[in-house]
Structure formats: structure tokens, C-alpha cells
Amino acid sequence: MPHHFAEIAFTSMVKKVQEEMGSRSSYARMESVPDSVNHRLTEAEAGFIAGRNSFYMATVSETGWPYIQHRGGPTGFVRILDENTIGFADFRGNRQYVSVGNLMNDDRVSLFFMDYPNKTRLKMFGRVRIVGLDEQAVLSRLEMSDYRARIERGFVILIEGFDWNCPQHIFERYMPEELSAVTAPLTARIAELEAALARAIESSPAK
């Protein structure tokens, strides 16, 4: 079974550049890994995606121009529908509809899921089916009941291939709640010491 991500990404021109730069042999081994299943999610990929609150999605217009969009929502807004399929609700944004328009012409997407604190990146190729508001059975699996945003449609993505990327040149970034988890013990300790100091000052004899 081929390495699905490499089969899509490593075109003849890409392989030519790999040859010129001396990396072709290592990627040839990657392509020849037996029983590759990198188009079906394991617990590792499913858990990683479920832990994200954003990702990047690339589409291509009918004129051939690529377009990258940031997609965000509550943690877990990208739903794992099965081992080959993910989906998410399309919340109303700036109403340019560039990605939606592109997908009506070409259903292929490239996705980047990022974990900045752990310098981890999951790349994915897929094909999108746009889900209308009349498909409530599907949309109900994509809704976030505790997130106040208007849903205009759903995206269901059939995974064609994925690959974990190296951590080089990914710089750590942290959400406020992630920083709070680290600084909370320090803040509590500072408050404790300040209170102890205040008591000591109050109990000390006046000069």
C-alpha cells in the first residue's frame, strides 16, 4: 500500500528537486513503507485534532491561485466522524466566501493542524463535501452547543493522506489559559508570601 501523503505531495517535479538537493533517497524509503495507512486516523491523530482550537486550510481558485484561511473555534470544533473523515461547522465570518467558492470548483484541500507549545504539526490532504443547512442529521454532529456563532454550512472532509512534520522552526506560542496553568502556583505562592509579610509587619513592635 503506498504512502498516501507522499503519493500526492511528491510530484515528478518535487522528486527532481529532492534529487538535486540530496534528500530523494530518504523520501523514497518513506514512500516504500509497507502497509502504510496514513489516510486512516489512529488514536494519535484523532486526539491531536480534537485538542486543537484552530487550523489552516488551503484551497485553489478556478484561476489557479492558492488561498490559505485560518479556521478557529472552541477546542474540539473539528469533529472526528470516522477513521477516514473529519468535519466542522462553518461559522459566519467576514462573508467573503473565498474558500467556499474555491471548493465549489475544486474540492481538494490541504490542512495544517498546529500545536505550538509542543512544536508539533500534522499535515493533511483531503476532499471536501459542503453540507447545507437542510442536512440536519450531518450538521447535528458538527454543532457546538456552547459556542455562540451562526452556522452557515458544514464541511465534511474525506482524508486522502496525512503526515506528521518535524518541529524545526516552529516557535512555541501559548494561549492565556496555558500560561495560567504554569503561573498559577507562582501567583499563589507570591500571595502567600505577601500575606506572611503583611502579618509580620503588623506584629512587629513600632519603633
Where are the regions a protein language model picked out?
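Binding-site signature for planar aromatic cofactors or substrates
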Residues: 1-207
